[in-house]
């Protein structure tokens, strides 16, 4: 008798704007037998709280400039969204707080308390997967350093050997010249990014998807497939 195929391992990135609404789809993937690692953002929550406290909000190529005061807002907001998502998924979810559980990053001093994530294999994630549970990753790195959740998703996909990287967003996919595209290759995506053809939150998503695709990982942004 042949052995049953190993379950596929996939990273699901959910934005703070759609995090709670994504619980059903995440559970569905897990129930299909996939090993699902969720990386969530908290962008809207962070921005609201920074504005409430009078902390300047500034983005550089889709990444948040983060002062020492701002990184505390990031931590609090990430922990809040993480707890809400874990509650929505129920007992299957395992909270993984990156700054405590080994998410590694290289500091980017010009942006303040910000880091570029490194491919890594946090022990708590591996333990959760072995137990058939769903790690819920808040992407604040050891430091603490604010790490863009899209970049963290790609780094974890590489470090954990994921087969797929799925971006669940509040937009249907990637638009090129105002047209929704079904697919784009990583090389073209990278060239267009270098040319400044995109702006805002799609920049880190496409950059992360292109990095993953170039490494052989199937990446999707909404309904758009990013291929090698």
Predicted regions and their residues:
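C-terminal catalytic "cap/lid" subdomain
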Residues: 2-228
């Amino acid at each position: 008798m042949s052995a049953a195929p190993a379950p596929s391992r996939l990273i699901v990135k959910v934005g703070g704007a759609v995090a709670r609404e994504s619980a059903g789809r995440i559970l569905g993937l897990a129930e299909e037998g996939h090993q699902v690692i969720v990386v969530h953002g908290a962008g809207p929550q962070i921005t609201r709280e920074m504005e409430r406290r009078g902390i300047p909000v500034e983005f550089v190529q889709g990444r948040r400039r983060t002062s020492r005061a701002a990184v505390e807002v990031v931590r609090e907001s990430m922990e809040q969204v993480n707890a809400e998502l874990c509650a929505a998924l129920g007992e299957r979810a395992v909270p993984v707080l990156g700054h405590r559980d080994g998410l590694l990053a290289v500091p980017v001093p010009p942006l303040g308390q910000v880091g570029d994530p490194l491919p890594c294999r946090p022990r708590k994630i591996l333990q959760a997967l072995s137990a058939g549970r769903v790690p819920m990753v808040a992407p604040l790195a050891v430091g603490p350093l604010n790490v863009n959740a899209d970049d963290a998703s790609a780094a974890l996909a590489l470090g954990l050997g994921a087969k797929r990287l799925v971006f669940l967003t509040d937009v249907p996919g990637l638009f090129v010249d105002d047209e929704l595209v079904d697919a784009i290759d990583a090389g073209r995506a990278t060239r267009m990014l270098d040319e400044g053809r995109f702006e805002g939150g799609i920049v880190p998503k496409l950059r992360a998807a292109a990095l993953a695709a170039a490494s052989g990982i199937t990446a999707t942004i909404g309904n758009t497939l990013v291929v090698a």
